Regions:
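Short, conserved beta-turn/loop elements at beta-strand boundaries and strand-helix junctions
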Residues: 60-65, 114, 134
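Short, glycine/small-residue-enriched coil/turn segments at secondary-structure junctions
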Residues: 41-51
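Long, low-complexity intrinsically disordered regions
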Residues: 221-334
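OB/S1-fold single-stranded nucleic-acid-binding modules
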Residues: 1-40, 205-213, 223-232, 238-240
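Short alpha-helix capping/helix-loop boundary micro-motifs
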Residues: 88-93
């Protein structure tokens, strides 16, 4: 599938809400090479190697003597991040931080599945953590909501198209969808069976987040629908979504591969805007300038992993949270 856009030598840090990131259970690498980038694909098709978050640091705790776990809440839930010896600056920041505090986090998206549990945890391996203010947090909420609504619109469009798999990727790209999203949507359809019922529930979460920033509500309702809920979603009607500037579906004429098109599935035309894929703004200062390939995951996380599995973790501030485990990986972790 298409290569991801990069900024210099680094992949773009995309923005997703914690509620959707918490639902992510698909990760993959496009090659077997040791340092090949790893991607987490969310239920709306966001394909994340790196992600950028701004929210409230609600808790910092020791997983063991060498690993810290932090929780950063947005209006929809909480992101979990683990810092150890291979992340000295984020670890030092978390050690000295006093919760609650507004912070930004840039890092690698990861998933982890314990051997003895039928559950997948998502987390962010930190590249940088910085102090920000409420205005930065609010701007992040707006940008994450706008990116989420665009992805939902593209996904809805994709569900109405007669293609699946690589054929759908090519068809979406031919219509003008960003290559990264065009590669993620078919994988999300195949892995999650994401329905329009879920899309509309997530759409409502994004709208409520915008209303929260505008001062029209006090909190965002929890996302209590799973990606595959609602059957095939054929009867679900989505509320208002952004207009997509895409080529007409009838203008797309691609050669269908062996994996051919599924006729009965509804795919909608979602669009991946550059806005969604933009690198973090300067005032967020959330990344180190010369990050290239993924570093090996700290071995000390092996011990942290068993602890993280068994932790019930309560989130002090926001809602649902993705309870990620530190992963021992040969490459970057989630």
């Amino acid at each position: 599938m298409s290569a991801s856009p990069v900024v210099g030598t680094r992949e773009i840090a995309y923005r997703v809400f914690a509620a959707e990131f918490d639902d992510a259970s698909l990760s993959y690498s496009e090659s077997d090479e040791e340092r090949a980038p790893n991607y987490v694909v969310t239920p709306t098709g966001a394909r994340l190697n790196r992600t950028f978050v701004a929210g409230v640091l609600t808790e910092v705790e020791h997983v063991n003597d060498e690993v810290l776990r932090g929780r950063i809440a947005d209006p929809t839930g909480a992101f979990v991040t683990y810092a150890g010896q291979y992340q000295p600056e984020p670890m030092a920041f978390l050690e000295g931080a006093t919760a609650p505090a507004f912070v930004s986090l840039a890092g690698k998206a990861r998933t982890y599945e314990p051997d003895d549990a039928d559950v997948v945890y998502s987390s962010v391996r930190p590249e940088s953590v910085n102090t920000v203010d409420a205005d930065v947090r609010d701007r992040w909420i707006v940008s994450a909501a706008e990116a989420t609504l665009r992805r939902i619109a593209v996904f809805d469009e994709a569900l109405s198209m007669p293609y699946r798999g690589d054929d759908l990727t090519r068809a979406l790209e031919a219509r003008g969808v960003d290559p990264t999203l065009a590669a993620g949507v078919p994988r999300a359809i195949d892995h999650y069976g994401t329905t329009r019922t879920y899309l509309d529930a997530l759409r409502e979460v994004a709208i409520q987040a915008l209303e929260l920033v505008a001062g029209d509500r006090d909190q965002v309702d929890p996302l209590d629908v799973a990606p595959g809920d609602g059957g095939d979603g054929g009867d679900a009607v989505l509320g208002p979504l952004p207009e997509l500037d895409l080529e007409p579906a009838e203008s797309v004429d691609i050669e269908v591969g062996e994996a051919d098109a599924d006729e009965g599935d509804e795919l909608g035309e979602p669009e991946a805007d550059a806005g969604e894929a933009e690198a973090e703004p300067d005032d967020f200062e959330a990344e180190s300038d010369e990050e290239t390939a993924d570093e090996p995951e700290p071995e000390l996380l092996d011990s942290a992993e068993s602890e993280a599995d068994s932790e019930p973790e309560s989130e002090p501030v926001a809602e649902t949270e993705s309870e990620p485990e530190p992963e021992p990986e040969p490459e970057p972790v989630a």
